């Protein structure tokens, strides 16, 4: 696990059937840490998670990012958070907190509902009003499967066969341009640490 930005840590797993890394994030907030889409860490990474306790919430951005969430929940006793429209699709996983567009997770992470890949796909905007690092960095946006960083240095959508409704997803993504952000953190593929909004705008202009 490494600190990608002050108070924001990442680690990843590689799978033979995907040409990109699957990334998890640990976000330190006032008095707690929130995990997002956590994959299995390397065995020698576990002590790093103990350092950033208490881990109070684990966020799933979509139904396909269950990954190692139950291992983390059992180890740290964290509440599991997911989009309200994703809860049924996540069964038999039990969701402790269902969130909707505009909700704040842990008082700082603003929920952006991005339906299309799946009904409850969501992104997280690090609200600059409540998150000092986001304010200093020009805004931070985190996405699950709505956009991926593949190939490295570029943005793309996941394969069409994995999308519930491709036209709806493309419409949903337009709302990202309503937010001010420079950093784009991605749970699939390579993050963009500078010029993130410009890169998203350029990518959206390529979509039919």
How should each PLM-predicted stretch be described?
Residues 58-62, 114, 187:
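Ser/Thr-glycine-rich phosphate-binding loops at phosphate-binding pockets of nucleotides
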Residues 1-3, 26:
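Short, exposed beta-strand/loop patches in secreted or surface proteins that constitute
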Residues 19-21, 93, 99, 118:
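Residues that act as N-cap/strand-start positions at coil-to-secondary-structure junctions
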Residues 40-107:
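Active-site HxH/HxHxD metal-binding segment of metal-dependent hydrolases
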Residues 10-57, 90-91:
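Pre-active-site segment of Zn-dependent metallo-hydrolases
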Residues 6-9, 15-17, 32-35, 41-42, ...:
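Metallo-beta-lactamase
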Residues 23-25, 101-103, 122:
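Residue-level detector of beta-strand structural context in well-folded domains
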């Amino acid at each position: 696990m490494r600190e990608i930005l002050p108070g924001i840590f990442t680690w990843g797993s590689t799978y033979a059937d995907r040409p990109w890394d699957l990334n998890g994030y640990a976000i330190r907030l006032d008095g707690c840490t929130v995990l997002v889409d956590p994959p299995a860490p390397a065995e020698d990474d576990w002590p790093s998670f103990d350092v950033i306790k208490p881990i109070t919430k684990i966020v799933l951005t979509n139904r396909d990012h269950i990954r190692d969430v139950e291992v983390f929940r059992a180890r740290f006793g964290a509440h599991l958070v997911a989009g309200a429209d994703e809860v049924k699709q996540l069964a038999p996983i039990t969701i402790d907190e269902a969130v909707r567009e505009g909700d704040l997770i842990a008082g700082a992470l603003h929920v952006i509902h991005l339906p299309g890949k799946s009904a409850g796909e969501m992104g997280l905007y690090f609200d600059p009003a409540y998150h000092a690092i986001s304010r200093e960095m020009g805004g931070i946006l985190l996405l699950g499967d709505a956009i991926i960083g593949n190939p490295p240095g570029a943005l793309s959508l996941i394969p069409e066969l994995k999308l519930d409704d491709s036209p709806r997803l493309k419409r949903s993504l337009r709302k990202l341009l309503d937010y001010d952000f420079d950093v784009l953190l991605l749970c699939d593929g390579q993050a963009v640490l500078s010029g993130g909004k410009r890169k998203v705008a350029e990518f959206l202009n390529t979509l039919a």
